[in-house]
Amino acid sequence: MGLTSVHVGLDDTDSPLGLCTTFVALAIVREASRIGAGFADLPYLVRLNPNVPLKTRGNGAVAIHFLVEEELVPRVEEAVVRALDDLSERHGKTDPAAILVKGDVPRAFRSVYLRALTEFIPSSYVRSVLERFKGESVKLLYSRSKRPRGLVGAVASLGAYPLEDYTYELIVYRSPEERSESRDISEDLLLELDRKYRPLVFATYDYSSRRVLAVPHGPDPVIFGLRSLDPEILVNVAVDVLEKISHAGYLLFKTNQGTSAHLQRYKPVALVRPYDSVVVRGSVAEKPTVISGGHVIVNVCDETGCLQIAFYKETGRLNRVAKLLSRGDLVEVGGGVMKKDGLVLNAEYLRLIKPALNVKRLNPLCPKCGSRMTSAGKGKGYKCPKCGYRAKEAAKIYRVAPRTLEPGTYFQSPSAYRHLTKPPEILGLRPVDATKVLLSGMWFM
């Protein structure tokens, strides 16, 4: 008998008080492996639109892709249900769901994934998609309510399969009973790893703000997460580093993190909606305004309307670049749209397509001594303050001065990255295939 492909997507198992959907995935992987299940790919950590209001922390869902004998499918289902019962929070803001697909993932799930990356989609839409696939091949495997909020992420995580643009993340865990903000790992150890492997390991440390990016500070069970384009590097790190710290296991994910997958959709300003992750193009309408806190506000207009763009102080270098924009600059801006006395796009990157000319209007030079002349009075022309020469017919001259800001793409400082942000140091690099690591069995513990 041949192997059956089984895909399980799950979401919304954590709460502000702790736990983590990726830790539930580790429990499922351990139990599935113990009963003899195989895996078609690494587990997926799928980040969705970071701007939606209904999220706990990073708006991430998880999908696990099995290859199993048909008779093992019920036992895989039991492993999923048991892990969700044991390791998902009982909290008012937690509403988990798990979807199981036997065979190929429906193409309609792909549409859910792409929409969930860039906009706020209601669970009613996802339920209508599921209605089309009632039967043995697609089923709601787990929920605690009739309309679980985790349904959107669960379906979207399955729709991401197979990922075409991806990176990897090794997540190392402590016991879920530990809920302190501090972690038992030294900054020096993470700095050593960053210096040894960058840029193939990335988004670990922000040298400009001297801030560790790989370590969370909440009550969840994650000690740290290392991101890379090479899964073998991460497995080697796991073997080396985990001898030096106390931990409760690790899991290697394939993920859409670090791909900027949420900023691939261009919209005219008139079609921008709250919570969109979107790219807009237009002209700077007026000189940037610096408001309280050092944040920069820029009005960008296209042929359909105008939109306020916010470059927050926390974006670091992006905030500093925004101050150098001028009226008439043609720009492209990507980011998340929020509703604050109208719509505001919180910028994540800026591309200066065509800078406006920096034209200076100057008094003429004295033809005798070369000094800059001054006005001799209304209708009286100009006079030279140095030699006294007068020129009644002289006129202002115009010069194009160089701009401080050159055409190009400008990014946030690393400490302001979203999970999905693609760091500039990995632009143009491709991920290493994970088949060797998958077969080695070293991708979880």
From Swiss-Prot:
GO molecular function: ATP binding; ligase activity, forming carbon-nitrogen bonds; nucleic acid binding
Family membership noted in the UniProt record: Belongs to the TiaS family.
Alphabetical keyword list: ATP-binding, Cytoplasm, Ligase, Nucleotide-binding, tRNA processing
EC number(s) given by UniProt: 6.3.4.22
Function of the molecule: ATP-dependent agmatine transferase that catalyzes the formation of 2-agmatinylcytidine (agm2C) at the wobble position (C34) of tRNA(Ile2), converting the codon specificity from AUG to AUA.
Catalytic activity: cytidine(34) in tRNA(Ile2) + agmatine + ATP + H2O = 2-agmatinylcytidine(34) in tRNA(Ile2) + AMP + 2 phosphate + 2 H(+)
Entry superkingdom: Archaea
GO cellular component, as recorded: cytoplasm
DNA-binding region coordinates: 278-349
Localization (cell): Cytoplasm
UniProt GO BP: tRNA wobble cytosine modification
Protein name: tRNA(Ile2) 2-agmatinylcytidine synthetase TiaS
Top-level taxonomy: Archaea, Thermoproteota, Thermoprotei, Thermofilales, Thermofilaceae
Pfam families in alphabetical order: TiaS_FLD, TiaS_TCKD, tRNA_anti-codon, Zn_ribbon_TiaS
Disulfide bonds: none
Organism: Thermofilum pendens (strain DSM 2475 / Hrk 5)
